[in-house]
Design a protein with these regions (language model features):
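ATP-dependent phospho-/nucleotidyl transfer catalytic cores
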Residues: 1-54, 168-175
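Generic structural signal for well-ordered, non-transmembrane alpha-helical segments
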Residues: 24-31, 122-126, 152
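Short helix-capping and hinge/turn segments at secondary-structure transitions, especially at repeat
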Residues: 28-35, 39-42, 60-64, 84-94, ...
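Active-site acidic catalytic loop and adjacent metal/ATP-binding pocket
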Residues: 37-82
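Active-site activation/catalytic loop segments of kinase-like enzymes and analogous catalytic loops
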Residues: 78-111, 121-141, 149
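A structural signal for short hydrophobic/aromatic patches embedded in well-ordered alpha helices
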Residues: 116-118
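ATP/Mg2+ or Mg2+-diphosphate-binding catalytic cores
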Residues: 128-178
């Protein structure tokens, strides 16, 4: 996805100036997430808690409509659903840090699963979903401001999630986040 977006970017010309202004930040975040997940895959042992489950590709406000949509269902690690739900809470103004802490504390993941969860939280799927809609002309470019205006808050949210997971298992530090 990151490579494809870089390819598309060359063809933007001056059509998507606002999108282009923030693309480097989100591509960098995506590269961080990919590296974090690749490192977890290479260094951590999986156990029976890491089996594939039926997951949602995305969780959003239309969950009731997409719950049984086969195009929104994938086989993946359970951390996918958890990370999508945590992102949903943040971006839909339903964020309560006590609820997030309770969710994380209720998880029984392996170390690999927790690293995967945090790597997925780092990956800016929320940005790329809007990006695709803008490129496909189903959303206006100004929609990206909803994400951009929350960059600092989302970084604080990531720090909080990192700290909560670290109460259960020590994660490798993401330097720019500390």
């Amino acid at each position: 996805k990151v490579d494809y977006i870089n390819y598309q970017r060359v063809h933007f010309n001056k059509e998507y100036l606002l999108l282009d202004d923030y693309l480097d930040y989100f591509l960098g975040l995506a590269e961080n997430a990919i590296s974090y997940i690749q490192d977890a895959t290479a260094k951590e042992k999986k156990d029976e808690r890491d089996e594939l489950v039926i997951s949602h590709r995305r969780i959003n406000s239309n969950l009731k409509k997409i719950y049984y949509n086969v195009e929104n269902i994938v086989l993946d690690h359970i951390s996918r659903d958890v990370s999508e739900y945590l992102k949903y809470l943040f971006f839909n103004e339903e964020l309560d840090y006590n609820t997030v802490a309770n969710i994380i504390n209720s998880l029984n993941f392996s170390r690999y699963g927790y690293r995967l969860l945090f790597g997925r939280m780092l990956f800016p799927s929320h940005f790329f979903d809007i990006y695709e809609n803008i490129i496909n002309n189903s959303q206006k470019e100004l929609e990206i401001k909803k994400i951009v205006l929350k960059i600092c808050d989302y970084e604080s949210y990531l720090k909080f999630i990192f700290q909560e997971i670290n109460k259960k298992t020590k994660l490798p530090i993401v330097e720019w986040l500390t």
